[in-house]
Amino acid sequence: MKKVFLCAILASLSYPAIASSLQDQLSAVAEAEQQGKNEEQRQHDEWVAERNREIQQEKQRRANAQAAANKRAATAAANKKARQDKLDAEASADKKRDQSYEDELRSLEIQKQKLALAKEEARVKRENEFIDQELKHKAAQTDVVQSEADANRNMTEGGRDLMKSVGKAEENKSDSWFN
């Protein structure tokens, strides 16, 4: 019993110490619980902050990716436009060259036609000259023939007149007294 009594005395003496200790323990538990909650809140806040950073980084990455995609698209569009402009310029140059070539061909064709017309005019003029020469030649031949005919006629008439004169002279001679 001594032991029980001793325990009871010790317990009664230790009750305020235990009570105080229990209060301290409860406070310590509450404080530990509060620290746990604070730590949990801090961890949660850190997690939220980390998550927000990750979300912000993801947004930034997407924005950068979109900007890069937009830049690539703009570059591709600019390159496509440049290629199209180059093709249009080449097509325009080809068209201009073709038109210039066709204009040159038309000009050459017109020159050929003018030369052919001038040649034809010259040939016609020359033919007219040849015709005029031929007419003059024929006129000259006609004049020669006419002259020969006139000369022959004159000779014939002269011969006839001579014969008449000779005949008359013979007649007169025969009619004369002194024959």
From Swiss-Prot:
Residues 34-61, 82-103, 158-179 have a biased composition (Basic and acidic residues). It holds the Pfam family DUF5384. InterPro entries: Uncharacterised_YfgI (IPR020231). Residues 63-79 have a biased composition (Low complexity). It comes from the Bacteria. GO terms for biological process: DNA damage response. This is Uncharacterized protein YfgI.
